Amino acid sequence: MNQSVRALEYEAMLLWRHRDMRQPSARGDDRRLDRSAYILLSRLELAGPMSIGQLSEAFGVASSTVHRQSAAMLCAGLVERIPDPEGGIARKFRLTEEGRRRLDEERGRNVRGLERVLAGWSEEDTAAFAAYLRRFNAGMERLSAQGPPPA
């Protein structure tokens, strides 16, 4: 697998998710993760256990939004609540084995879709695109952290 495509997968997920990139499920049960679950699970995979407050801050959304999303993921068995490993009083979420499995499946579908979209691109072009997309997403995050421009 092209390493640049794998690195590009998460960046592309933040920007868009087009139906033509996704392959139908072989089982036909469409157990795909929605975008918010995918992004939250990816963050937990990268950062380790996080509280609702930490997730809320990381994504710049209200804690009520994260609470709703995390409750759905808890019910689906994708995350579990654990005591803070650092001894804090807030409970944290971490991936379950099912959550990790579903995240890996979804990531595999995304990578295969990106490989189809980028077929014929050189390694250099793919790497440049990944770098520009990372830069674009970082700029979007920086602007959202600053809030709306003054009127």
PLM feature spans:
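N-terminal leader segment of winged-helix/HTH proteins
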Residues: 1-36
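Terminal interaction helix/tail motif
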Residues: 3-11, 105-151
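Pre-recognition alpha-helix immediately N-terminal to the DNA-recognition helix
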Residues: 39-45, 101
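Short capping segments at the starts of secondary-structure elements
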Residues: 47-51
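Key DNA-contact positions within bacterial/archaeal DNA-binding proteins
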Residues: 64
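Short helix-coil-helix linker/hinge
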Residues: 30-37, 96, 122-123
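Charged, amphipathic alpha-helical coiled-coil/dimerization segments
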Residues: 71-127, 131
